[in-house]
Amino acid sequence: TMYDNPALAKSAVEALERDDVRRIVLVRPAVEAGERLGFLPGDLTQKVDPYLRPMYDALYEMLGYEKVARLIEHNIIEIAPLAFMRGRSLNESFVILDEAQNTTVEQMKMFLTRMGFGSRAVVTGDITQIDLPKHQISGLRHVLNILEGVEGVGATEFLSKDVVRHPMV
């Protein structure tokens, strides 16, 4: 599926403001599209920042830089690479897994089993834009087949005509 970053960020922020959740957790696999970035210097935030930039951009657009920085500082908004989710239990959280087409089956299972009480997960991705090695099955494609028809789980598929982009694209 494809989605609109600002609309999804808005849904997460609204859930937080209604006290439906206590925090927003943004997760993304660190998979490069084509070219290799190699070793990145810096701390964890600096290393994963390039992969999570689209999520930051959507939040900044909605809330402004200062408010987002304050919410991150207070751990109300957390931005985490998928690789560091193992062993966690995410309670009362609005959790967004972006670019899920680039998860393996094992990573998707690990992510979905992190959901705790009072949490909701939104998994987004585009199965036409998989950047995994050819022999690996996309976790998104796999989970769409497995969870079809399961109560409490829904999927929305957008077609190319639903995606609004500049005509030049």
Each language-model region and where it sits:
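Conserved helicase motor core of SF1/SF2 NTP-dependent helicases
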Residues: T1-L97, Q101-M168
